[in-house]
Amino acid sequence: MEKLEMIYEGKAKKVYRTDNPDFYWVEYKDDATAFNGQKKGTIDNKGVVNNKVSAVFFKLMESKGITTHFVELVNDREMIVKALDIIKVEVVVRNIVAGTLAKRVGLPEGTILPKTVLEYYYKDDNLGDPLINASHIAALDLATPEQMAFIKETALKVNDIMREYLAPVNIDLIDYKLEFGLHKGQVLLGDEISPDTCRFWDKTTGEKLDKDRFRRDLGNVEGAYQEVLRRLTGEA
């Protein structure tokens, strides 16, 4: 497959056309942003880690019957994916209170939620990706009720799969963001699953192994990302 012109550059990835219109070529960047682009920086080899970690999780999902956009890794920093028409709803799944949820509901970070919380955000950088609900999604015609039912069911399945997978490597899945899109009319799991889009805490120490180290100036961001990759793949 041949890599052609770039068609999109986001905060974390570049997307290129290929000589097959059904597939895109994705390059993961080292650029880091937080607070909807208000804070910017660079994390050495972040793109490499996120590419490889995403591949691990996408392959895991496929093995459990969840269809994703992932096709194959090209190299350390790039992968081939199915071309998606992105659904403009970001799905956040929360198991333990952290980040904005702590501020919104007044519970301390680290509080275990008795039930998994699902949140929907309108994927629009200009608006700051605001929190929305099912009524907003219907009114804005962002997705059909059937698509949202499938997305909700899939997001919860992903949660069960990831928590079970991460437990033996001593990682707690605090929360994470998923994106979905349409490929030939079918809803697929897209974007990435990485320390950029998930909160990973060490089960024993509570050490943060994700982008919160960048957001909160905790230091050793590169080391935390590499540690996640090491635990998942054994790769240093």
Curated annotation (Swiss-Prot):
EC category: ligase
EC number: 6.3.2.6
Catalytic reactions of this protein: 5-amino-1-(5-phospho-D-ribosyl)imidazole-4-carboxylate + L-aspartate + ATP = (2S)-2-[5-amino-1-(5-phospho-beta-D-ribosyl)imidazole-4-carboxamido]succinate + ADP + phosphate + 2 H(+)
GO MF, any single term: phosphoribosylaminoimidazolesuccinocarboxamide synthase activity
Pathway connected to this protein: Purine metabolism; IMP biosynthesis via de novo pathway; 5-amino-1-(5-phospho-D-ribosyl)imidazole-4-carboxamide from 5-amino-1-(5-phospho-D-ribosyl)imidazole-4-carboxylate: step 1/2
GO biological process, one term: cobalamin biosynthetic process
Stated family: Belongs to the SAICAR synthetase family.
NCBIfam families xrefs: purC
HAMAP family attached to this UniProt entry: SAICAR_synth
Name of this chain's protein: Phosphoribosylaminoimidazole-succinocarboxamide synthase
Species of provenance: Desulforamulus reducens (strain ATCC BAA-1160 / DSM 100696 / MI-1)
